[in-house]
């Protein structure tokens, strides 16, 4: 129970830090840490597939894209070092306070699929998507296809200067 509460509290603190930091580089680092921590929380809750997708999509693709944009801003190194003072002490303090004030005992492993013996969450997600929600999945694919064709229809045609 201590690790679950600590991870959720860290998610809350990181989401506040993303909005309140003044440096775009530190805001990006806090958002990457937030995505990694949220995938850790999803993994603890039993959503393994969503945790892996969260890591692959957000941390992998968006972080690399934003890092290239931030590298183009050319922020001085002295400004980056000024933002890292004092945050480790605050993190250790919050971790200790959370451990001291634990009220409920540890309840053991919990997940979303405790009633089904031998089934994994990815298998259950596949059964739910392709058996029960197949019509919504097909409708979603049609909407995305229309959006793709709409993007090409609306985009202006560029001509060369000849």
From Swiss-Prot:
GO terms for molecular function: NADH dehydrogenase (ubiquinone) activity. It is a multi-pass membrane protein. The keyword Translocase applies. It catalyses: a ubiquinone + NADH + 5 H(+)(in) = a ubiquinol + NAD(+) + 4 H(+)(out). It is found in: Mitochondrion membrane. It comes from the Eukaryota. Keywords: Electron transport, Membrane, Mitochondrion, NAD, Respiratory chain, Translocase, Transmembrane, Transmembrane helix, Transport, Ubiquinone. Its EC number is 7.1.1.2. GO terms for cellular component: mitochondrial membrane. It is an enzyme of class 7 (translocase). Pfam families: Oxidored_q3 (PF00499). InterPro entries: NADH_UbQ/plastoQ_OxRdtase_su6 (IPR001457), Nuo/plastoQ_OxRdtase_6_NuoJ (IPR042106). The chain crosses the membrane at residues 1-21, 32-52, 55-75, 87-107, 129-149. Core subunit of the mitochondrial membrane respiratory chain NADH dehydrogenase (Complex I) that is believed to belong to the minimal assembly required for catalysis. Complex I functions in the transfer of electrons from NADH to the respiratory chain. The immediate electron acceptor for the enzyme is believed to be ubiquinone. Belongs to the complex I subunit 6 family. This is NADH-ubiquinone oxidoreductase chain 6.
């Amino acid at each position: 129970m201590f690790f679950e509460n600590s991870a959720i509290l860290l998610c809350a603190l990181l989401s506040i830090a993303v909005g309140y930091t003044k440096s775009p580089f530190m805001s990006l680092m806090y958002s990457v840490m937030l995505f990694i921590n949220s995938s850790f929380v999803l993994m603890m809750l039993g959503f393994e597939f969503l945790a892996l997708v969260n890591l692959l999509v957000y941390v992998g693709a968006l972080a690399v894209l934003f890092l290239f944009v931030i590298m183009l801003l050319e922020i001085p190194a002295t400004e980056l070092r000024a933002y890292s003072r004092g945050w480790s002490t605050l993190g250790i303090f919050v971790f200790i306070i959370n451990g001291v004030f634990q009220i409920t005992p540890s309840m053991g492993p919990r997940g979303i699929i405790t009633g089904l013996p031998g089934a994994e969450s990815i298998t259950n997600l596949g059964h739910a998507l392709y058996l029960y929600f197949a019509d919504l999945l097909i409708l979603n694919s049609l909407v995305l296809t229309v959006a793709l064709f709409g993007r090409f229809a609306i985009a202006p045609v560029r001509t060369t200067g000849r």
